[in-house]
Regions:
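Flexible glycine/proline-rich
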Residues: 53, 57-58, 67, 80, ...
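Phosphate-binding glycine-rich loops and their immediate beta-loop-alpha structural context
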Residues: 158-281
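Short glycine-rich anion-binding loops that position phosphate/pyrophosphate groups of nucleotides
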Residues: 93, 125-126, 210-211, 283-290, ...
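Short Gly/Thr/Asp-enriched flexible loops that form oxyanion-binding sites at enzyme active sites
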Residues: 280, 287-301
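Phosphate-interaction motifs
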Residues: 2-193
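Solvent-exposed alpha-helices and their adjacent loops that cap or buttress functional pockets
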Residues: 79-81, 94-98, 111-115, 128-129, ...
Length: 435
């Protein structure tokens, strides 16, 4: 009798876990794309401003105050002379011009308090001597060295009164104010040596360069075209580094040409330690594949792969990587596309991290019609000028944002919304300044 054996059960492979996404993604259009503004707002909603720190007042210039700063006492705390001149009691001048002049003798060795009817020499910023309440300029002296007056002098003329700027407890600086040298001087005059501000965000740029095989191919073709020696530069990373430094943040750049996913993952994790934002750039083009950074992000934390209604830069990648949920944004390949995404998304992120409000929009009128894309926001390099007192834009070169020559001739990048009809002459467009 034949023996029938039960077939061995083959275990089905476990399905791969879905990549961890990020919550609250905005709605999309019929093509599954977000608008540029919605995507920007979404990214900014995922980050918080850098925690405030106490900074010495002179070093806080350009930073945003994180609390109201109150005067600890009257500012100024004492009454001082505003000008170099002579201090005296204004009451001794009340008869000047009724009908004749009044002469005030200058006391060369002033007593304390000053004798009524006399004046003493003072310097700007010095305390008013006891018994005086005004300061007169030296051009009122006659040939004998006495002060000659033909009209009474008002009390506190030429003086800066104690508490005349701020009284004790008054607000010197409001929360959110950007500190400039004038505000710094007020804080210092009030005796405040430290202020709570948001520090400049720490940004790490991870530049993924062409790998050795791609580099060798580039050099081979360059030699065939007569270029014996070409510098190994990354134009995308250079453009983004310069744009980031222009925003007055702390920038570190890390370059790599690794082809190893594990090495790149380790590099990104190290970049995130101590950073407030990681920006990934790449000049490595692999047709039909994700850029090298995007492919390693899902295991590192929540990742958002989005399609945005914009050209260039339709594919956008953002992640919050461990440890610490550090924001990381991946920029498209190429200086122009990367700059567009930087202006559209990275700059607002950095302002949010810095505790600053959104940047004011610069508008300029078109000098001629500009073509639109029917479904996507596009971007045009432009030059700016003032015509009749109004800002006017004109296309730089061929107006191709992917062309570095056009970018080099531009002052700004104009944002052209989608539409079936060209932008008419004279219509204002939002512009992002390049410098």
């Amino acid at each position: 009798m034949a023996l029938f054996h039960r077939k061995k059960q083959v275990e089905a492979p476990e399905p791969e876990a879905e990549p961890l996404g990020l919550p609250g993604a905005p709605e999309t259009d019929m093509s599954g794309r977000r608008s540029v503004d919605d995507h920007c707002d979404y990214l900014c909603s995922l980050v918080q401003a850098v925690p405030p720190v106490a900074v010495e007042v002179p070093r806080a210039v350009g930073l945003a105050a994180c609390e109201d700063v109150h005067a600890p006492h009257d500012v100024p705390v004492v009454t001082t002379a505003v000008i170099d001149g002579y201090a005296l009691d204004s009451a001794s001048t009340r008869m000047a011009g009724r009908p004749g002049a009044v002469e005030i003798q200058v006391d060369r060795r002033p007593p304390s308090p000053v004798i009524p009817g006399t004046a003493v020499r003072v310097m700007a910023g010095s305390l008013l001597p006891e018994g005086t309440d005004c300061v007169l300029p030296p051009d009122l002296l006659n040939a004998d060295g006495d002060i000659v007056l033909f009209s009474p002098v008002k009390r506190w003329a030429g003086a800066r009164l104690a508490g005349s700027d701020y009284g004790r407890g008054e607000v010197l600086v409001r929360n959110g104010t950007i500190l400039h040298p004038g505000i710094i001087s007020v804080l210092a005059s009030a005796g405040i040596d430290e202020v709570f501000v948001r520090p400049r965000p720490k940004v790490v740029i991870v530049a993924v360069r062409a790998d050795e095989d791609q580099r060798a191919e580039i050099e081979r073709k360059a030699r065939a075209n007569g270029a014996d020696d070409i510098a190994s530069l990354d134009a995308t990373a250079a453009a983004i580094e310069s744009a980031t430094r222009a925003l007055d943040v702390n920038v570190t750049v890390v370059s790599t040409n690794t082809s190893s996913d594990s090495e790149l993952t380790r590099l990104l994790a190290n970049a995130g330690r101590g950073a407030d934002l990681v920006i990934a750039t790449s000049d490595r083009i692999v047709v039909g594949q994700q850029d090298p950074v995007s492919s390693v992000l899902p295991p590192m934390g929540g990742t958002d792969f989005a399609r945005v209604a914009m050209e260039p830069g339709a594919n956008q990648v953002f992640a919050l990587i461990d440890p610490g949920l550090v924001p990381l944004i991946v920029l498209p390949v190429g200086p122009g596309p990367a700059l567009v995404s930087f202006m559209a998304f990275v700059r607002p992120l950095l302002r949010k991290l810095s505790g600053l409000p959104p940047a004011e929009k610069l508008k300029a009128e078109t000098d001629r019609p500009i073509a639109r894309h029917p479904e996507s926001t596009t971007f045009v390099p432009v030059r700016l000028a003032r015509v009749g007192g109004r800002p006017v834009l004109s296309r730089a070169g061929m107006g191709d944002v992917t062309h570095v020559v056009d970018l080099s001739m531009a002052d700004a990048i104009a944002v052209v919304g989608a539409g079936d009809e060209p932008v008419p002459t004279g219509m204002p467009l939002t512009c992002w300044r390049l410098g």
